[in-house]
C-alpha cells in the first residue's frame, strides 16, 4: 500500500504533457496544430482518465487501510530555515481527487462537441487542462505555502476561462471582477499563512494541528492572535467559495463557456474554499468564536443565495445563485463541526450541479439556432418553455438534477442536505429554522427554472402574436388551447411579462368577452414566421449527462447506513463515507450529536421532504403550464379576485421582486461605495499630485527662472557695474560681521 502512495505525486502532473504539447504545437507548427485540433481532446481525456484510475486505487486503499500518508522533500536554505514541500494523501485528498477527475473527464468530453466550432478550441483545452492540474495540486498539497501556490494558479485559470471570450466587454469585465474580488480573499489568506508561520515557525499541517490540540487549550499561545490569523485564512475560503459578502463575482462568472461553469461550480474553484476549511478544521474547531462566525456566514450565504435566485431570468445565473446557497450549507455544516455532512454534501452537490450546468448548456446549444449566438437571448428563460418535447433526454436529466437539489429522495442531495438540516437543528434552532426554510426556497426556485425552461410552450415563437389568423402562431395561445373561462388570463400572462416575475404583477384585467381582441405578445428579434425549433444535442454531449445522471441517482448510497457499530456505549450507524473518513475524523472531536437513530432520521426526512414538496407545489402554481390542474379549479383566479386593486401587499411583492432581481442591490452598493469611492479618491489624489506637489516643484522652478531672468541684466559686461555690486556685498558683509 505504501508503494502505491509513493507515486501519488504523479497525479497532478499527468495532464501537463498534453498542455505542453499543444503549446509547442501552436508555437512551432501552428497551422497543422489548428487543422488537427479535435485530436487533442483525446490525449487530454486519456491522461485525466489515468489520473482518475490512480485516484480510485488510492481511495480503495484509504477505505480498506484507513491511513494517512505524507511524503516531504526538504530544501535547506540555511541552518535556520528550510522549505519543505511534498504531498499528503488522506481521506479528504482521495475524495477530492475522485471528484475532480470524474467531473473533469465528463466536462472534457462534453466540451469537445460544445466548443467544436469555436476558434479558441485549443486555447480552451489548454486552460481547462491546466485548471484540472492546479486543482489536483491544491488538494494533494502538504503545507500552506503549497496550497497558496496552487490556490493562485486556480485563480489565474478561472480568470482566463471566465474571460475566455474576452472580445465581449461583459466577459472581460466579469473576469476582472472575479480576479479583484478573489484578491481580497487571497490577501487575507497570505497574511494568515505568514501569521501562523510567525507563531509556529512552520507551515506544515501537522504543526498547526499540534497547536490546536496542545497549545491553544493550555493557553500556550495568544488565542486572540491565533483567532485573527485563522480568520484571515477563512477570508480566503470566503472569497473562493463565494460566501457573503465576497460572493458578487460568482453570477458574473457565467459569462464564460458553459462547460467551465460546470467545472467551476462542481469540482474546482468554489470547492477549493470548502476544501481549505475542511483541511484546517482541526485547527478551527479549537477556536469556538471563529466556528460560530463560520456557521453564521454560512447561514447568511445559504439564505441570501436562495432569495437572489428567485427572480433571475438567466438560466446560468439562477444556477450560480443556487451554487452559492448550497456552498452556504457546506459552510454551515463545517461551522457547526459536522465534517462528514459537509463533505457528503460537497460530493452529492458536485455531481448534481455538474448535471444541471451541462444540461443548461445543452438547452443553450439548442436555443442558439433560434435566437442567435447571444447569451442575453440563448440563456434567457423568458424565451424558452416547452422544450420537453424537443430535448427529451436533456429534460429528463435536468429534472433529476433539479429534484436532487430540491432534496427529493432517493436522489443524491436528499441524503446530504437532510444530514446538514438535522445537525443544524441539534446545534441551534436559529440555524435550523433558516436552513429548513431555505430548503423550501431551494425547491421553489429550482422547479421554477425547470418549469420556465421545459414546461408550457416555446415562447420565442410568440412574436407579433395575435389571436387572429394573421398572426404567425395564431393557433397557440399563451394560456393554452382551451382554458377555463374562469381563469384570469392576466395572472397567467404576468409570469410571461416583466421578466418572468417571481410574483404576479398587477396587470389590468381583460374581460372574458374580449378574448379575440387580445393584444400582441412580441419579442424584438427573429423573423415574423419561423419554423426552426430546438433539437437534441449530439451523443458526445448527451453521454456526460447520462453518466452524471447515474452519479446523481446512486452516489447518495455512500452515506446510507449499512452496519451498526458501538462507540462509548452508543450505537453508531456506519456508512461507506464514515468508514472512509475515519482517519480524518480522528484528528478532532466531531459534533457528538451528529449520530441519530433511524426514527429521528425518518422524522427529519419527512419534515425536509414536506418542505421540498411544498416548494415544488408553490412553484407549479406560479409557473406551471396552462393545463395546470389548479388553473382548471380557478385557483389562480380566486387569488386575484381577493385583491382587485393595487394594495400594500402588491407593493411589498414588487419590492421583494425588485430586490431579488437586482441581486439585493449589493453590487450597486459595492459600485457606489468602493468603485466610485476609490475612483474619487484617485481623482483627488491625482489633483493633489498635479496641483499641489507638482505646483510646489514647478513654482520653485518658475521662481528660479524669473529671478535668473532679472539677475541676468546685471551682468551687462561693464566693469563699473561689477565693481559697484562687489563693493555693495563687501560692505554688507563687513556691516553684519562684527
From Swiss-Prot:
The keyword Transferase does not apply. GO terms for molecular function: NADH dehydrogenase (ubiquinone) activity; quinone binding. Pfam families: Proton_antipo_C, Proton_antipo_M, Proton_antipo_N. One of its GO terms (biological process) is electron transport coupled proton transport. The chain crosses the membrane at residues 9-29, 39-59, 89-109, 125-145, 147-167, 185-205, 219-239, 258-278, 280-300, 327-347, 354-374, 396-416, 425-445, 542-562, 610-630, 691-711, 717-737. The keyword Transport applies. Its EC number is 7.1.1.-. The gene is ndhF. It catalyses: a plastoquinone + NADH + (n+1) H(+)(in) = a plastoquinol + NAD(+) + n H(+)(out); a plastoquinone + NADPH + (n+1) H(+)(in) = a plastoquinol + NADP(+) + n H(+)(out). This is NAD(P)H-quinone oxidoreductase subunit 5, chloroplastic. Belongs to the complex I subunit 5 family. NDH shuttles electrons from NAD(P)H:plastoquinone, via FMN and iron-sulfur (Fe-S) centers, to quinones in the photosynthetic chain and possibly in a chloroplast respiratory chain. The immediate electron acceptor for the enzyme in this species is believed to be plastoquinone. Couples the redox reaction to proton translocation, and thus conserves the redox energy in a proton gradient. GO terms for cellular component: chloroplast thylakoid membrane. It is found in: Plastid, Chloroplast thylakoid membrane. InterPro entries: NADH_UbQ_OxRdtase_chlpt_su5_C (IPR002128), NADHpl_OxRdtase_5_subgr (IPR018393), ND/Mrp_TM (IPR001750), NU5C-like (IPR003945), Proton_antipo_N (IPR001516). It comes from the Eukaryota. Keywords: Chloroplast, Membrane, NAD, NADP, Plastid, Plastoquinone, Quinone, Thylakoid, Translocase, Transmembrane, Transmembrane helix, Transport. It comes from Saccharum officinarum. It is an enzyme of class 7 (translocase). It is a multi-pass membrane protein.
Amino acid at each position: 500500500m505504501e508503494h502505491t502512495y509513493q507515486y501519488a505525486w504523479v497525479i497532478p502532473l499527468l495532464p501537463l504533457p498534453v498542455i505542453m504539447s499543444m503549446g509547442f504545437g501552436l508555437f512551432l507548427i501552428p497551422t497543422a496544430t489548428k487543422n488537427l485540433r479535435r485530436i487533442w481532446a483525446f490525449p487530454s481525456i486519456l491522461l485525466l482518465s489515468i489520473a482518475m484510475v490512480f485516484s480510485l486505487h488510492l481511495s480503495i486503499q484509504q477505505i480498506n487501510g484507513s491511513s494517512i500518508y505524507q511524503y516531504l522533500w526538504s530544501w535547506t536554505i540555511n541552518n535556520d530555515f528550510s522549505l519543505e514541500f511534498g504531498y499528503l494523501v488522506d481521506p479528504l485528498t482521495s475524495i477530492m481527487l475522485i471528484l475532480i477527475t470524474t467531473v473533469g473527464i465528463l466536462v472534457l468530453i462534453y466540451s469537445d462537441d460544445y466548443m467544436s466550432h469555436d476558434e479558441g478550441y485549443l486555447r480552451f483545452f489548454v486552460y481547462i487542462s491546466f485548471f484540472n492540474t492546479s486543482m489536483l495540486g491544491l488538494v494533494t498539497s502538504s503545507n500552506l505555502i503549497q496550497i497558496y501556490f496552487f490556490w493562485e494558479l486556480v485563480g489565474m485559470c478561472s480568470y482566463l476561462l471566465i474571460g475566455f471570450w474576452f472580445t465581449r466587454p461583459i466577459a472581460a469585465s466579469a473576469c476582472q471582477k472575479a480576479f479583484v474580488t478573489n484578491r481580497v480573499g487571497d490577501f487575507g489568506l497570505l497574511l494568515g499563512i505568514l501569521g501562523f508561520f510567525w507563531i509556529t515557525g512552520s507551515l506544515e499541517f501537522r504543526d498547526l494541528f499540534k497547536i490546536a490540540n496542545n497549545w491553544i487549550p493550555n493557553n500556550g499561545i495568544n488565542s486572540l492572535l491565533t483567532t485573527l490569523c485563522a480568520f484571515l485564512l477563512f477570508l480566503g475560503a470566503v472569497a473562493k467559495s463565494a460566501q457573503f459578502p465576497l460572493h458578487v463575482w460568482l453570477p458574473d462568472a457565467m459569462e464564460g463557456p458553459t462547460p467551465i461553469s460546470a467545472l467551476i461550480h462542481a469540482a474546482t474553484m468554489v470547492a477549493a474554499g470548502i476544501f481549505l476549511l475542511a483541511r484546517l478544521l482541526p485547527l478551527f474547531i479549537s477556536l469556538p468564536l471563529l466556528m460560530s462566525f463560520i456557521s453564521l456566514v454560512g447561514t447568511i450565504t445559504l439564505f441570501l443565495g436562495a432569495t437572489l435566485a428567485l427572480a433571475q431570468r438567466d438560466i446560468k445565473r439562477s444556477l450560480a445563485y443556487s451554487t452559492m446557497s448550497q456552498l452556504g450549507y457546506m459552510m454551515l455544516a463545517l461551522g457547526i463541526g459536522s465534517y462528514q455532512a459537509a463533505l457528503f454534501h460537497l460530493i452529492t452537490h458536485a455531481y448534481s450541479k455538474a448535471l444541471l450546468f451541462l444540461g443548461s448548456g445543452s438547452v443553450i446549444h439548442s436555443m442558439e439556432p433560434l435566437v442567435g449566438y447571444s447569451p442575453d437571448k440563448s440563456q434567457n428563460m423568458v424565451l424558452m418553455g416547452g422544450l420537453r418535447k424537443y430535448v427529451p433526454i436533456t429534460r429528463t436529466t435536468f429534472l433529476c438534477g433539479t429534484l436532487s437539489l430540491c432534496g427529493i429522495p432517493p436522489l443524491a442531495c436528499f441524503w446530504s442536505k437532510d444530514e446538514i438540516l438535522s445537525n443544524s437543528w441539534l446545534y441551534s434552532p436559529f440555524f435550523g429554522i433558516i436552513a429548513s426554510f431555505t430548503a423550501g426556497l431551494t425547491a421553489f426556485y429550482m422547479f421554477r427554472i425547470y418549469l420556465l425552461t421545459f414546461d408550457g410552450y416555446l415562447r420565442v415563437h410568440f412574436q407579433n402574436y395575435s389571436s387572429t389568423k394573421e398572426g404567425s402562431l395564431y393557433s397557440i395561445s399563451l394560456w393554452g388551447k382551451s382554458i377555463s373561462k374562469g381563469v384570469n388570463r392576466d395572472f397567467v400572462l404576468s409570469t410571461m411579462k416583466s421578466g418572468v416575475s417571481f410574483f404576479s404583477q398587477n396587470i389590468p384585467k381583460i374581460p372574458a368577452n374580449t378574448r379575440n381582441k387580445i393584444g400582441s405578445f412580441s419579442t424584438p428579434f427573429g423573423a415574423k414566421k419561423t419554423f426552426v425549433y430546438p433539437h437534441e444535442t449530439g451523443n458526445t454531449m448527451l453521454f456526460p449527462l447520462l453518466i452524471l445522471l447515474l452519479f446523481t441517482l446512486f452516489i447518495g448510497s455512500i452515506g446510507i447506513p449499512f452496519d451498526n457499530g458501538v462507540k462509548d456505549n452508543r450505537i453508531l450507524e456506519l456508512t461507506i463515507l464514515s468508514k472512509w473518513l475515519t482517519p480524518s475524523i480522528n484528528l478532532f472531536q466531531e459534533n457528538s450529536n451528529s449520530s441519530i437513530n433511524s426514527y429521528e432520521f425518518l422524522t427529519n426526512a419527512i419534515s425536509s421532504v414536506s418542505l421540498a414538496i411544498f416548494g415544488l407545489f408553490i412553484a407549479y402554481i406560479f409557473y406551471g403550464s396552462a393545463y395546470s390542474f389548479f388553473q382548471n379549479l380557478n385557483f389562480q383566479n380566486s387569488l386575484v379576485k381577493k385583491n382587485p386593486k393595487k394594495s400594500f401587499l402588491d407593493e411589498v411583492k414588487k419590492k421583494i421582486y425588485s430586490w431579488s432581481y437586482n441581486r439585493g442591490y449589493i453590487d450597486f452598493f459595492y459600485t457606489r461605495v468602493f468603485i466610485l469611492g476609490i475612483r474619487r479618491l484617485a481623482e483627488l489624489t491625482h489633483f493633489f499630485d498635479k496641483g499641489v506637489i507638482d505646483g510646489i516643484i514647478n513654482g520653485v522652478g518658475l521662481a528660479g527662472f524669473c529671478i535668473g531672468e532679472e539677475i541676468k541684466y546685471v551682468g551687462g559686461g561693464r566693469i563699473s557695474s561689477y565693481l559697484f555690486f562687489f563693493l555693495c556685498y563687501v560692505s554688507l558683509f563687513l556691516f553684519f560681521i562684527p
